[in-house]
């Protein structure tokens, strides 16, 4: 057993990350091919009258078997990853360059359930969307994003590199338990959707694969790598814009909303010079002026809807955490 653990620990987490990214790209391609040559779209549930936002990829006539197929696989996926997080925290390992046994187990579990989801879509189609609200899947990821803002406040600040003290204090409890929530948010959202081959779905599944990969590398140095983690945060820009374009929604609001979070908050966690930051600001401002000069300046303030929601939620949630967080938690962390 000790020899096995030593061999596992020699597997570099950086190499595991690269292999995981390659797997994610290849599997996204498999979803496209499956939708092109295998899947046939069933009769979908029509949009009810008076519903503003509607997720149309739901069976019009679901059965107990179609529902059971997705719920059993979802619960198996969720339970296995939560169990691995629990066992890992029980061991209290140090962050290492190599993989731990539970990293290997998490990577294999995620790869298995990703593959099962493809077959489940091809045979039974439905995701969790049949039984839960669309807003639950959306907000599960939104909460994940602003929780990252809270946890990273101590390292990169919240606004232009400036830290908010009480947010850093609130991050202590979040940092300890965030793995359970992040695992739920990603796995729940992953099983919400059938593996459909639209642009938005393909980008969304690629993003979910990368988040599952990040979650599998807990207690390794790559899990904390700022370039990788900020890449994950910023990737949501592309996904949100593609979904907005496909749905005919207001794509500039999502593009500049999420880019605004990047230039105001996230890029201050990157090891780049002040000159490079100014260049990024100039590029952001130039594109913003160009788009809204064409679109019209009467709605320019909409860019604060997305970024403002994330910042406000991060600050308000931090205040709520401090109200319920035991007073000795901060001193214990220190």
Predicted regions and their residues:
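Cytoplasmic membrane-interface regions of multi-pass membrane proteins
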Residues: 2-6, 80-98, 152-172, 216-229, ...
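An N-terminal, globular interaction/scaffold subdomain
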Residues: 2-119
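Short juxtamembrane and helix-loop transition motifs at transmembrane-helix boundaries
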Residues: 59-65, 159-171, 187-196, 211-222, ...
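Hydrophobic cores of alpha-helical transmembrane segments in multi-pass inner/ER membrane proteins
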Residues: 69-82, 138-156, 206-214, 255-267, ...
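Intrinsically disordered, low-complexity segments enriched in Gly and acidic/Ser/Thr residues
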Residues: 215-296
